[in-house]
């Protein structure tokens, strides 16, 4: 039984994913269905956490839109994600960047890896 589950999940895993970590700035292209139409919506922000493993792995991206912080959690291997672009590599010393929720403006900047 365990082997069957492992086989099924292996077939569902995406292989074209870029490597990214918390602190990186991503542009996530999400497929959105509105009625009968399907379009691509772009969500750009900083990865504040990655959790899980295998098919159930998720990541959370945070951005500030019109002065309001917006966080969105995506399953990594979902077919709803068309593609993920890594825009910047950030240098951080934590795996979970929850402290960014309390910072505003320039204080919330993350150093870039050259």
From Swiss-Prot:
PROSITE patterns: RIBOSOMAL_L19
Gene3D superfamilies: 2.30.30.790
Keyword Ribonucleoprotein: yes
A cellular component annotation (GO) from this entry: cytosolic large ribosomal subunit
Keywords: Ribonucleoprotein, Ribosomal protein
Segments crossing the lipid bilayer: none
GO biological process, one term: translation
GO MF annotation terms: structural constituent of ribosome
Known role: This protein is located at the 30S-50S ribosomal subunit interface and may play a role in the structure and function of the aminoacyl-tRNA binding site.
NCBIfam families the UniProt entry points to: rplS_bact
Family indicated by similarity: Belongs to the bacterial ribosomal protein bL19 family.
Protein name as annotated: Large ribosomal subunit protein bL19
Organism: Bacillus cytotoxicus (strain DSM 22905 / CIP 110041 / 391-98 / NVH 391-98)
